[in-house]
Amino acid sequence: MYSETPIKRRPSSRIYVGKVPIGDGAPIAVQSMTNTKTTDVEATIAQIRALEKVGADIVRVSVPTMDAAEAFKIIKQSVNVPLVADIHFDYRIALKVAEYGVDCLRINPGNIGNEQRIRSVVECARDNNIPIRIGVNGGSLEKDLMDKYREPTPQALLESAMRHVDILDRLNFDQFKVSVKASDVFLAVESYRLLAKQIRQPLHLGITEAGGLRAGSVKSAVGLGMLLAEGIGDTIRISLAADPIEEIKVGFDILKSLRIRSRGINFIACPSCSRQEFDVINTVNELERRLEDLVTPMDVSIIGCVVNGPGEALVSHIGLTGGANKSGYYDDGVRQKERFDNLNLVDSLEAKIRAKASLMANRIAISDKTD
């Protein structure tokens, strides 16, 4: 596999959300947000655990009321993944969840209130060693900025962010990250580009309110892909009107596509045509479903014929090339004598992939111990 990655990460400072490092070259963290009622403690805990199972590094939880803050206390005690409390309007809620061990506070400059309220949040965060995210959003800019610019613009989002960066600077508080999200790809991208030139703090990327699963994934991949390819971004959240688990999957797929961070299998599969010797589409779909639990990074090529199959297999950890009745099997680019019956491909491939993943995981573990 071609291994060169031309991406040079933007230099930034580092903060920690719980034990997860953000910025200064740390792996780009993948986040999601619960969509349960936070006061439904049982449902919220279940969703957080499900997100952690599919690889979420950090989970954000909306805390809109003091009742939700009390629920957050129980939730925080029941999960392992770091939690960010999403705070709007009432700064006192931030002070309350800080008592309960929150790992990060997200505040929205457009509605959190005056500088004195921000000062109270910052002092509380400092006392409890909690980082802050300044979360600017094109849909909730301050009224004076909307009056000035008439609509959300990159300059408006930047000005909103810098106002609050300046406040934190005056308070000598540097444990924060910043986001300037918008639902329009170009608005978000240009806003982040401007911000990246102004500060050294880590940047949290996202296209807000991106849409449903398909359209939202595409929009997020385009917008975040542009920024990540330029080295901008230290943590990401894919905002989808879908199951939050899908946000984590799409997030890792974007990072995987740019070879920034890999988790699980990278499937290389042909779209299929008249030359296919087996049902490529159903084979890939079934393997993706069965192998979701694997976390070891590996490339698996599944090609329906011999036109591109051998070439892709040469640069894959596991490769399958379609043949009449039986298909060729490659291991680390080497064609094996063993061939797979086309009627039983999924079971055969699953066994080989799991065995390979186990072997590779052991090698990684040994290498880590040696280092």
Curated annotation (Swiss-Prot):
InterPro entries xref list: Dihydropteroate_synth-like_sf (IPR011005), IspG_bac (IPR016425), IspG_bac-typ (IPR004588), NO2/SO3_Rdtase_4Fe4S_sf (IPR045854)
Protein keywords: 4Fe-4S, Iron, Iron-sulfur, Isoprene biosynthesis, Metal-binding, Oxidoreductase
Needed cofactors, names only, are: [4Fe-4S] cluster
Instruction: Please name the GO terms of the biological process aspect recorded for this protein, alphabetically.
Output: isopentenyl diphosphate biosynthetic process, methylerythritol 4-phosphate pathway; terpenoid biosynthetic process
Cofactor comment: Binds 1 [4Fe-4S] cluster.
What metabolic or biological pathway is this protein involved in? Isoprenoid biosynthesis; isopentenyl diphosphate biosynthesis via DXP pathway; isopentenyl diphosphate from 1-deoxy-D-xylulose 5-phosphate: step 5/6
Under the GO molecular function aspect, what terms does this record hold?
Answer: 4 iron, 4 sulfur cluster binding; 4-hydroxy-3-methylbut-2-en-1-yl diphosphate synthase activity (ferredoxin); 4-hydroxy-3-methylbut-2-enyl-diphosphate synthase activity (flavodoxin); iron ion binding
Enzyme class comes to: oxidoreductase
**Annotated binding of [4Fe-4S] cluster, by residue:** C270, C273, C305, E312
Give the catalysed reaction(s), semicolon-separated.
(2E)-4-hydroxy-3-methylbut-2-enyl diphosphate + oxidized [flavodoxin] + H2O + 2 H(+) = 2-C-methyl-D-erythritol 2,4-cyclic diphosphate + reduced [flavodoxin]
Q: Name one Pfam family in it.
A: GcpE
Q: What is the annotated role of this protein in its UniProt record?
A: Converts 2C-methyl-D-erythritol 2,4-cyclodiphosphate (ME-2,4cPP) into 1-hydroxy-2-methyl-2-(E)-butenyl 4-diphosphate.
Q: Which protein family is it in? A: Belongs to the IspG family.
Q: What is this protein called?
A: 4-hydroxy-3-methylbut-2-en-1-yl diphosphate synthase (flavodoxin)
**Source organism phylogeny:** Bacteria, Pseudomonadati, Pseudomonadota, Gammaproteobacteria, Alteromonadales
